[in-house]
Amino acid sequence: MRIALVSDWYYPKIGGVASHMHHLALKLKERGHEVAIVTNNRKTGKEKELEEKEIDIIKIPGVVSPIIEVNVSYSLKSTKELNGFLKAFDVIHSHHAFTPLALKAAKAGRNMNKATLLTTHSISFAHESKLWEALGLTFPVFSKYLRYPHKIIAVSRAARAFIEHFTDTPIEVIPNGVDDKLFTPNWDKEELKAQFGIEGKVVLYVSRMSYRKGPHVLLNAFSKIEDATLIMVGAGELLPFLKAQAKFLGIEDRVKFMGYVESATLPRIFGMADVFVLPSITAEAFEIVILEAMASGLPVVATNVGGIPEIIRESESGLLVPPGNELELRNAIEKLLLDDDLREWLGNNGRKAVEEKYSWDKVVEQIEKTYEEVLSIM
């Protein structure tokens, strides 16, 4: 098959959509398909890797928003250019609903009688009331565009429940994937801790430093926990506040803020951790970072919001707590730090779940099958 993966939200935009598209492209290429990534005209930092893998990258010029770092509009000329590129493909697969390029590609694909799909990665609109108000008048337009795909893929049941408000297009749930060969439990924890200058148990947080991810809640909970180090990986608007918060709580010596970390380094950081924590305040459709922790054999403490309970089975691969509840978060972390057998059991279960359901090989098989099903009705 000749497959175009289309989205404004590709690199250098950091996040789950970009990661998903990139790994999907690589795996589809491995399976013998011709693949191209169609995105905006910013430098992605992935050009060399894609060239080496013989994956084309097609850039469509548009107006880039300085706030969300993606294209927010396209000229008539750019739209015609997009349509011209897409003619060469059998499958048009857009990513991230409610973004201009994805919706334009869905319309173009349907009008050209191509197998047209859209993956929805988010439910965050449902938790931004001001955004609801601002976009209220344009939701009918979005609903119209969401009728163009032959099928919508949702990364979780939570994402499906959200997108169902706007379309009656058939929806299939196919989760995100993780590279289970890159993220593994086969590290020497003590050796890695020594390399990073850390002793004792390690609690790990990897995500954006923003309010909705709950890092401030984690700091408050961790301040009551003794004999452990908290590693916080990620950048974001809350980072200066969090550093001041750690100092105020008197735990700055036990909290290491590592900022943004290159993806090649992340497996080693997961490899030295004992417990992974993601205390999200608001709902997320799907957290790839939880899969990375599970693939690394780590027990996970997370909040029971959005699609997270679909990944973490309570007391089987991790522990779930209510969002914003510092006491229950602290108790869950302490429970794991104090019980070596429980940590190992939960970590092993998480790794097994990844191998059975969430490895990229498993996920791409499902997506490929969906392509074939849509092509069969053309």
Enumerate the predicted regions with their spans.
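A short, well-ordered alpha-helix in the C-terminal region of glycosyltransferases
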Residues: E328, K335, L342-K357, Q366-K369
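Nucleotide-sugar donor phosphate/pyrophosphate-binding loop at the beta->alpha transition
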Residues: A115, F125-K144, A161
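Short alpha-helical donor nucleotide-sugar binding micro-motif in glycosyltransferases
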Residues: L86, Y260-V261, R268-A273
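Acidic donor-binding loop of glycosyltransferase active sites
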Residues: H150, R254, G271-A285, L298
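Short hydrophobic beta-strand element within catalytic cores of glycosyltransferases
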Residues: P299-A302, I312
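Carbohydrate-associated surface elements
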Residues: N41, A158, G177
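A conserved mid-protein helix/loop that constitutes part of the nucleotide-sugar donor-binding site
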Residues: S19, H23, K201-K224, E237-K243, ...
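Conserved acidic donor-binding segment of nucleotide-sugar-dependent glycosyltransferases
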Residues: E314-S315, L319-E326, K335-D341
